[in-house]
From Swiss-Prot:
Protein purpose: Catalyzes the oxidative cleavage at the 15,15'-double bond of carotenoids and the simultaneous all-trans to 11-cis isomerization of one cleavage product. Carotenoids like 11-cis retinal can promote visual pigment biogenesis in the dark. Essential for the biosynthesis of the 3-hydroxyretinal chromophore of rhodopsin from zeaxanthin and for proper photoreceptor development.
Catalysis performed (reactions): all-trans-zeaxanthin + O2 = (3R)-11-cis-3-hydroxyretinal + (3R)-all-trans-3-hydroxyretinal
Manner of cofactor binding, per the entry note: Binds 1 Fe(2+) ion per subunit.
Keywords: Iron, Metal-binding, Monooxygenase, Oxidoreductase
UniProt KW Iron keyword: yes
Protein name: Carotenoid isomerooxygenase
Pfam name, any one: RPE65
Domain of life: Eukaryota
Gene name tied to this protein: ninaB
GO biological process, one term: retinol metabolic process
Amino acid sequence: MAVHQEKLYPNCDSGVWLRSCEEEVTEPLEGTITGEIPSWLQGSLLRNGPGSLKVGSMRFEHLFDSSALLHRFAINDGSVTYQCRFLQSNTFKKNRAAERIVVTEFGTRAVPDPCHTIFDRVAALFKPGESLSDNAMISLYPFGDEIYAFTEGPVIHRIDPETLDTLERRNLMDSVSLVNHTSHPHVMPNGDVYNLGMSIVQGRLKHVIVKFPYTEKGDMFAKAHIVANMSPRWPLHPAYMHTFGITENYFVIVEQPLSVSLLTMVKSQPSNEPLASSLHWYPNHETHIVLLSRRDGKEVKRYRTEPLFYLHIINAYEHDGVLVVDLCAYKDAKAIDAMYINAIETMQSNADYAEWFRGRPKRLELPLNATNCSRIEPRLLAQLGCETPRIHYDLYNGRPYRYFYAISSDVDAANPGTIIKVDTKTGETKTWCDTNCYPSEPIFVPAPGATEEDDGVILSALVWGGAGAHCRRVALLVLEARGLRELARATFCAPSPVPKCLHGWFLPRRTQL
């Protein structure tokens, strides 16, 4: 007789991350509306994230390896439609054609390709845009009137924001020789885009800031150029960074003690080892916060703080001689291990799993007149696990702000599927949740003519725990941003399971193609 094992986290259904979409939704589905969508809310919420863990009889080993699935919620005069399509990356097409995993991913080793010799694999080190996976399953960002899907490799993909077709593949090695970049560039009010990456500058590997100048006509990528650079703290172990900050006068680089070992990468290339094997956490080394001048691109000052791991910076700004950096911080990098598929499947029997994801929003206050390498102690902003944070981006990115919105990262919470609003001034928090419901990154959309920072709505994609019809259910949630009161939702029944998504972008109707 089978012994029933008690779940350590009975309120958390990890299955929402383990689903694989089996059928795309190319023709828009009409949603069932409850409540009332504000009449001014018109446009599309575009989402990106893991879509399928399966290729033939094989399975990916890490969540970041899952085939990219694009989602669209189109809002039009109070009604909403839903679509989803797989990103047609080279990696996706090669895997589907072979019916097996033939391109090594972040955490998954591909099957050997008999056509590739050891010399081919060594040569691949010098052309990462073509040899590495281009499975851009993390985020979506606008470059002018075009939308691109991002991962951390140098290849991005332009998508059609209405059909979700994959239109174009761009290798940034061709324009600014980026060997990698973050999944979260900054889009400025004038349309310029900045991103942090790595490039060879005067024969040395550097962390660089690249500017893509906005142009109404022409190619933003053709005019891309490096505007700032800094040497890694450890030349052969550059820090892994998923985001960066930008303020009025500075680019803000948080150099955490999680590094990518270049030597391990070189050694592992012939054996086809995944990138994750090159990541190393150094618990006895501090985190450095580096300020690069937006005027001349040079390093101005650096600060030290406790060892911490982060994926997302919430915001950064200057005020009264202090530069403030808010971020979602963890004590170590176990959160990456927690996203291995085996770890997700066995979490209910892993007493340490909740601690792996025990992140908290913290604030670093950097006096601009401090001596170089001053030590800064972080300050807790809220006693809640917060991830995929968003702010009123258009008006408050890089400027003094008060509110941010996030989803819970506490798997042992009473309801892990919670949307959180944090008041950084008072420490007050507001939450929204529903039974067995798992929201995605909450995106703030300002109301027309808004004068208050939180005058607008929050949009979030919802999925539900469970099997059968539950795993095919997906919805768009609309919350009033001030109090997180539910205004409306549009619910759909997809033809196959809908996995939980990661990041996205809202396109108001006026900016759509």
